[in-house]
UniProtKB/Swiss-Prot annotation:
Predominant location category: plastid
HAMAP family: NDH1_NuoK (MF_01456)
Catalytic activity from the UniProt record: a plastoquinone + NADH + (n+1) H(+)(in) = a plastoquinol + NAD(+) + n H(+)(out); a plastoquinone + NADPH + (n+1) H(+)(in) = a plastoquinol + NADP(+) + n H(+)(out)
EC number(s) reported in the record: 7.1.1.-
Presence of the UniProt keyword NADP in the record: yes
Protein name as catalogued: NAD(P)H-quinone oxidoreductase subunit 4L, chloroplastic
This protein's GO CC annotations: chloroplast thylakoid membrane; NADH dehydrogenase complex
Species of provenance: Arabis hirsuta
Lineage: Eukaryota, Viridiplantae, Streptophyta, Embryophyta, Tracheophyta
Subcellular location: Plastid, Chloroplast thylakoid membrane
Amino acid sequence: MILEHVLVLSAYLFLIGLYGLITSRNMVRALMCLELILNAVNMNFVTFSDFFDNSQLKGDIFCIFVIAIAAAEAAIGLAIVSSIYRNRKSTRINQSILLNK
């Protein structure tokens, strides 16, 4: 693929995720948008690693680390969301004022 096409696709994914993260009122949707942002960044890592130096896999290895961290973040985030839902019966961000207590 052409470098510009992949970068434009990655920018679109990043902007869609950022827009969803800013406008989302649901915690699960916000976590999904955060994952979309991380996947766009991973796409950039792999693209630049492939474009600038084919012999080394630094971007690919860093991408694997980001995927592992994103999986841990998703597991912890969903555990927190399920705990909030059990206690408050809602996953809306604006109704959850946990830091005031």
